[in-house]
A protein has these predicted regions:
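Aromatic- and glycine-rich peptidoglycan recognition patches
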Residues: 78-95, 108-155
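Residue "hotspots" at secondary-structure boundaries inside conserved domains
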Residues: 55, 96-97
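Surface-exposed loop/turn and secondary-structure junction residues enriched for glycine/proline
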Residues: 23, 60, 79-80, 96
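Solvent-exposed, flexible loop/coil residues
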Residues: 24-26, 97, 140
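N-terminal capping segments
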Residues: 1-60, 65-73, 129
Length: 155
């Protein structure tokens, strides 16, 4: 659908451009001028907590930004409550029903990404803001064990 295509194209706007930042959120339409600015990580629960690093997004913050921007500032999936809340706003589906725009999760909702397409062999590709790469990246589905369809989509 056009809606799904726009979600993926919006996600691709940040590919390779925004650092991973534990607790990083942004409800700014378009580029957030704070991205890349050294800031202290104030959210607890990470080895980076208390350190200063370039501001960016965490995994769920990336999802929030994508849906917020795609909807023109009208929609935040999970209302900013992190990957677990985002998962709660999805209907479980099977992997073979995956479509671009669906959300994928690590066990325990410890990480979230967006299905962005398929490679030439038909394997799912995921766009996500990854701490291991310190950026928005496209990878395969390694580590992702659950998939859900956001209720945002009308089909």
């Amino acid at each position: 659908s056009e809606e799904r295509k726009q979600v993926v194209l919006t996600a691709y706007q940040l590919l390779g451009k925004v650092n991973y930042f534990w607790g990083g959120k942004s409800l700014v339409l378009g580029w957030d001028s704070r991205w890349g600015t050294p800031m202290e990580v104030t959210a607890a629960g990470s080895s980076s907590s208390g350190t200063v690093r370039p501001f960016g997004l965490d995994c769920s913050g990336f999802i929030d930004w994508v849906f917020y921007n795609q909807s023109g500032g009208q929609y935040i999936i999970g209302h900013g409550g992190g990957a677990s809340a985002q998962h709660n706003y999805c209907t479980p589906i099977s992997w073979n029903n995956a479509k671009p725009g669906d959300l994928v999760f690590y066990p325990g909702d410890s990480h979230v990404g967006i299905v962005c397409g398929f490679d030439s062999s038909g394997n799912i590709l995921i766009i996500h803001c990854a701490s291991s790469s310190d950026n928005v990246v496209v990878t395969g589905k390694i580590g992702f064990t659950m998939i859900g369809r956001p209720r945002y989509f009308t089909e």
